Every structure is written in C-alpha cells, then in structure tokens.
C-alpha cells in the first residue's frame, strides 16, 4: 500500500467538502501538474511549514501581503491588543481613520479612500463609481490583467487583441460583459481603435500598471502616460489596479515610479498586513459620489473592521521606515541576478526580473521580449512546471503557475537567497 503524506490525505478529505479541495483554484497545483497541494501548518518569517513538517522558503507570501514576513512580532502584538477590545463593531472606529490617513499620506494620487474586504470588491466598486461619474457604461481592460472574479472582468480577448467582451467562465451572461472591451497590454494601437469605435461610451480604462497576473510584465516606455493622455482626450477615467503593486514595488506604488496620475486606485494585500482587506480611492471630487456622501452605493458588513485596520496600520508604519524599500529591493535584485547568472553559466533559456519586492521568472532567452499575454504563452511553460516541482521538492515554495509573479519579504536572509540560487543552478545544469 502506498504511504500517503498528510497533505495527500487532507487534500482527499477536502475534496469531499470543498469544490476541488481548495478555496482558490491556483492553490490546487493543477496548473503545474502536481497531484496535490501542500497543506500548511504554520509560518514564520520567510518560511512555511507543511503538515508533514517540511520546511519551505516562501516566495509567495500569501500572494503578496506578507512583505514583513509571516507572523511579524509587531503586527501580531498590535492585533492581539485589538482582539481584547473586539473583532468587529459594525460601526465606525478610529483605526479606519488612521489607516485612511496613512494611505493618503503615502499614495500620491489618493485624496479620499473607502475600505472594503477584498481586491475584487475594490475593483467592482471603482468600476461602478467610474461609470456613475462619467455616465457611461463601457470599460477597457487588458488581456492577461486580472482584476478579481467579478463577472465583468472574466473576459478573454478571443482571437484578436481588439474584441467585444466574451465571457470565459460558465455562468457569466454575455449581456453582463458586452460593455467590457479587451485590448492588448503595451499595445496603444488596440486602445486607439477602441476609442475610435466607442469614443463617447467608454467610462474608464482599468489596468495593472505592472501586470503581475501574467507573471511580471512591465509597461513599455510611455505606455501608461499614453493611457493617461487618451483618457483625458476622451473624458474617460484611468484606474490603476494596484492591489498587487501598491506598497509592494515602492512605498507609493507603481504610480510613484512611473509618475502617472490615475483618477482612481484600487488596493489590497499589503494594506491589510495579512488580514482580508481591499480599498479604492482617488480624487476627492470623484470619491464624493460614493454613498452616503453621494448616490453611488457601496457597503460591507466587515468593511473597515478594527482587526484588519490595525494590522494594516502597523504594516504601513514599518514599511514606511527609511531604507525599508532599499533593503527589500537589494534582496530581490540579489535573487534575480543570481538566477540570471546561473542560467547564463549553463546557457539555459531563462531570465528573471524584479522591482521592489516583486519578481518574475521567464523560461525563455532574455533576448526574447515578453510584453504581452500572448508573448508569455510562447515561453516554455512545461519547463516552468519542472522547475517548480524540483524547487518544491528541495524546500523552495514558488507560485504554482507560470502566470503568477513572485514575492520576497524583508525576512528573507542572504542564506535563503543563496540556497534558492544554488538549487536553481543545479536544475539549469541538469536540464
């Protein structure tokens, strides 16, 4: 009889009670050809420990929030103090005001902010607000950019970069996505064509300023500025989805790096310090349309709850300390440089890149440009799966998809990074 691991046993049990055995599809490890995911028992610093007591260097960080590492002592202490005073009030609390003030202080283009419970809620609310403010219905999103699982975002571009929305999940009526237009990331011609065809109907463009849901694809020079310009020319709003990049690639998010001003910004992940949270914010004149100040409805039972707000406040306090992002960037660059040098030493088709505490791994030559979702699909996805399995078996926990970015924390040590590079070097040598 086969000896099964505790993770295998738990996964089999989970599938009896939870669809697919997980509460978010990527966690099942299906996209990397694994039979079962690893069930985690606890985490500390840069490490995960599974139910079989295997230890992993974690480069997912709960998909981005754990920029301080797991179980940061200061964040835990702040949460524990708040727990004694209540978990949720269903009423306003001072922590909401304090976190809002901190976000507005640090993010260059947010004058007012509203808290929700997830990134999906944030993007849904931002789109509703943009439509109400402009009195228009159509939105533009980019192929490969993910903005949550709301019906209007579950759209693929079909056979071309320029298309009317077609749902790519059962249960999404075509009527729901008929106003979702899809363009190709880094392709201004597709954007211009959409504005020419639907000039006075487009409420907004929503974009990840750095596309972290098709690995990690940077905007080409001037792309974001051109989006800003075409929105201005057509009285449309520009929304930056910084759920992933906000407080992760820089203290002021990607918008502070590229110096482009969105009208609205969505946030999540880091601002909750590991607790469920999302937010949307922007120009005051737009945000004043949100109920109860204005007519655009948005509400949430647990929105602004004191536990999430407390975790967020302490996290932002720590990452806003002088030198934090310099140190984080050095760690990410050391990892990326080491991986690139290892691949080059064995003439292996691979390259990596990073910004702040976020990185991307591409299984193709660095001479091949990866600027779009289509480009990413042409890389060696099968080799990524082999790399993932090898690293996992040797104690390195990477994102279980070639389409996901990786994350490093301030808790990762030089030894962690060196071990990761050495393992990758061995893989490149053997393959």
From Swiss-Prot:
The keyword Isomerase applies. It is found in: Cytoplasm. Gene3D superfamilies: Aspartate Aminotransferase, domain 1, Type I PLP-dependent aspartate aminotransferase-like (Major domain). GO terms for cellular component: cytoplasm. Its EC number is 5.4.3.8. The modification N6-(pyridoxal phosphate)lysine is found at residue 269. Pfam families: Aminotran_3. It is an enzyme of class 5 (isomerase). NCBIfam families: hemL, PRK00062.1. Belongs to the class-III pyridoxal-phosphate-dependent aminotransferase family. HemL subfamily. Homodimer. This is Glutamate-1-semialdehyde 2,1-aminomutase. It comes from Francisella tularensis subsp. holarctica (strain LVS).
């Amino acid at each position: 009889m086969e000896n099964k691991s505790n993770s295998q046993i738990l996964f089999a049990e989970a599938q009896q009670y939870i669809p697919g055995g997980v509460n978010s599809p990527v966690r099942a490890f299906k996209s990397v050809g694994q039979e079962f995911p690893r069930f985690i028992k606890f985490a500390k610093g840069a490490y995960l420990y599974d139910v079989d007591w295997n230890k992993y260097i974690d480069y997912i960080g709960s998909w981005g929030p754990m920029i301080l590492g797991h179980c940061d002592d200061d964040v835990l202490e702040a949460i524990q103090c708040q727990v004694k005073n209540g978990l949720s009030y269903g009423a306003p609390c001072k922590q909401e005001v304090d976190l809002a003030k901190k976000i507005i202080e640090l993010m260059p283009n947010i004058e007012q902010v509203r808290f929700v419970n997830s990134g999906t809620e944030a993007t849904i609310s931002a789109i509703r607000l943009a439509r109400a403010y402009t009195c228009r219905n159509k939105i533009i999103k980019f192929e490969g950019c993910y903005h949550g699982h709301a019906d209007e975002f579950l759209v693929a571009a079909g056979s071309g970069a320029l298309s009317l929305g077609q749902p790519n999940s059962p249960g999404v009526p075509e009527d729901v996505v008929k106003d979702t237009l899809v363009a190709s990331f880094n392709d201004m011609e597709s954007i211009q064509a959409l504005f020419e065809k639907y000039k006075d109907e487009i409420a907004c463009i929503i974009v990840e300023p750095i596309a972290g849901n098709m690995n990690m694809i940077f905007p080409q020079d001037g792309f974001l500025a051109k989006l800003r310009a075409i929105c201005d020319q057509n009285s449309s709003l520009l929304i930056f989805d910084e759920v992933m990049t906000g407080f992760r690639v820089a203290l002021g998010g990607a918008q502070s790096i590229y110096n482009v001003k969105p009208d609205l910004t969505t946030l999540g992940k880091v601002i909750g310090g590991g607790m469920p949270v999302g937010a949307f914010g922007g120009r005051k004149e737009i945000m004043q349309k949100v109920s109860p100040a204005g007519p655009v409805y948005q509400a949430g039972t647990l929105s602004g709850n004191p536990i999430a707000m407390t975790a967020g406040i302490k996290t932002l306090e720590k990452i806003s300390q002088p030198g934090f992002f310099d140190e984080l960037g050095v760690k990410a660059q050391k990892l990326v440089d080491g991986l690139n040098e290892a691949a080059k030493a064995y003439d292996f088709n691979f390259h990596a890149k990073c910004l702040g505490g976020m990185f991307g791994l591409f299984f193709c030559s660095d001479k091949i440009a990866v600027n779009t979702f289509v480009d990413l699909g042409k890389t060696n996805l099968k080799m990524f799966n082999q790399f993932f399995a090898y690293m996992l078996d040797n104690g390195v926990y990477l994102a279980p998809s070639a389409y996901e970015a990786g994350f490093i924390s301030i808790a990762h040590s030089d030894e962690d990074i060196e071990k990761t590079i050495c393992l990758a070097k061995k893989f490149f040598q053997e393959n």
